[in-house]
Amino acid sequence: MVDNSKIRVVVGMSGGVDSSVSALLLKQQGYDVVGVFMKNWDDTNDDGVCTATEDYEDVKKVADKIGIPYYSINFEKEYWERVFQYFLKEYKAGRTPNPDIMCNTEVKFKSFLEYALDLDADYLAMGHYAKTMVDENGVTHMMRPKDGNKDQTYFLSQLTQEQIKRVMFPLQDLTKPEVRRIAEEAGLVNAKKKDSTGICFIGERNFKHFLSEFLPAQGGDMVTPDGKVVGHHAGLMYYTIGQRQGLGLGSTKESTAPWFVVGKDLEKNQLIVEQGYDSPRLYADRLQASGMTFFTGNPEEDTEFKATAKFRYRQCDVGVTVKYHAASKTADVYFDEPARAVTPGQALVLYNGEECLGGGNIDAAFKDDKKLQLV
C-alpha cells in the first residue's frame, strides 16, 4: 500500500475556491502538500486595486486553515516573454490568439512545474477541471472531467506527455457545486468567491483599453465583400471572425439582418462585414493547423483518422477527418459538415469520445479549396 505522506505534491494556489479545495483534498488524502501562489502579472485592475495582493491573502488564510506551508513565486518575466509577446504578435498579425493555452503550456505547466520539481515535488496539482488516466503501459491520457460544464481540457490541449504525467487534477471527479460545498463545510474563506474571468492572469479589465496600451490602434473602413464602405472600425485587432456585437451598423434598405465580421484585409486596413448569420464567407470545410501536439506522443508517420474537434471554448464537438503530417507537425482537418467562424490564431482541439487527444493552432480555413480571407 502506498504511503501518501511520502509523496510531495505542490499545489498551484490562485486564491480561488478550485485550487483551495484541491489542496484540501490532497491534505485529507495524506499527501505532503505545499501550496504555492504564482504572480505572473502586475495585477492592478482598472479601479487601481492590486488583485494579486488580495488573492495571496486568501491563499495564506486557506493554507493556514488546512495546515500546509505556502510560498509565493514570481513568473512575470517568463509570462511577458513567452506568453504576452506571443499575444501581441498574434493580434498585430490580425489573428485572435488564445493566451490561456500558451500560459498553461509555457508557464503553469512548464516554469511552475520545473519550480515544483526543484522543491522535490513528486507531482504538481492544479485546480483545473480535467482528468488523467494511466494505461497498462504507463502512458498518461487526458480525459474529460465529470463536470462537462467546467471542462478545461480545451485549455490544456497543447501539453505534452512529460508534463501531464507529473500532474494531478484533484477535482476531476467533482462538479463545481460539489467543490463549493466542500469548501463551505471546511470553512474556507473563499467558498463563495466568484470565479475569475478574462485573459489568463490579466483579469477583468476593459480589453480594448488594455490592448491599446501596448498596440497602437489604427482605425479604418468597414467594407462589404464587394468593397462598399459602410462604417468605420477602431482597429482590426479589436474584432474577431463571426463577431456581431459592437459594430455599430444598422439595417439597410435591402435587409434588416444584423452585420457580422466575415474577414480582415490587413494590407488595406479594412474590416470586411456582411449582413446575415449564414454568410457563406463564414463557413469552412477544411482548416490547416500547425504546432500539433498529442498527449500520448506525436505519431512518427503521416496518419489519417476520424475524431471530433472544438475550435473555440464551450463549442459542441464537430465531426472531422484529420490528416496529420509528421515531418512538419501540421494537420489538414476536414469537417463532416461546414463549420462557421473558424478563426486563425485560435486552437484546434481533438477528441476521441471522452479522451482529449491534443491539438494545435489554426493557421487558415478553406472552402472548396479556396482560402478564406479571414486575415
UniProtKB/Swiss-Prot annotation:
Matching InterPro entries: MnmA-like, MnmA-like_C, MnmA-like_central, MnmA-like_central_sf, Rossmann-like_a/b/a_fold
Annotated stretches, region: Interaction with target base in tRNA: 98-100
Ranges where the record places region Interaction with tRNA: 150-152, 312-313
Signal peptide: none
GO CC, alphabetical: cytoplasm
Residues given in the record as ATP binding sites: G12, M13, S14, G15, G16, V17, D18, S19, M38, G127
Cysteines paired by S-S bonds: C103-C200
Cellular location(s): Cytoplasm
Keyword set, alphabetical order: ATP-binding, Cytoplasm, Disulfide bond, Nucleotide-binding, RNA-binding, Transferase, tRNA processing, tRNA-binding
Enzyme Commission number(s) of this protein: 2.8.1.13
Active-site feature positions: C103 (nucleophile), C200 (cysteine persulfide intermediate)
Class in the EC hierarchy, top level: transferase
Molecular function GO terms recorded: ATP binding; tRNA binding; tRNA-uridine 2-sulfurtransferase activity
GO biological process: tRNA wobble position uridine thiolation
Gene3D superfamilies on file: Adenine nucleotide alpha hydrolases-like domains (2.30.30.280), HUPs (3.40.50.620), Translation factors (2.40.30.10)
Any single Pfam family the record assigns to this protein: tRNA_Me_trans_C
Reactions accelerated catalytically: S-sulfanyl-L-cysteinyl-[protein] + uridine(34) in tRNA + AH2 + ATP = 2-thiouridine(34) in tRNA + L-cysteinyl-[protein] + A + AMP + diphosphate + H(+)
Function statement: Catalyzes the 2-thiolation of uridine at the wobble position (U34) of tRNA, leading to the formation of s(2)U34.
Family recorded in the similarity comment: Belongs to the MnmA/TRMU family.
Protein name in UniProt: tRNA-specific 2-thiouridylase MnmA
Organism annotation: Lactobacillus delbrueckii subsp. bulgaricus (strain ATCC 11842 / DSM 20081 / BCRC 10696 / JCM 1002 / NBRC 13953 / NCIMB 11778 / NCTC 12712 / WDCM 00102 / Lb 14)
Gene that this polypeptide is encoded by: mnmA
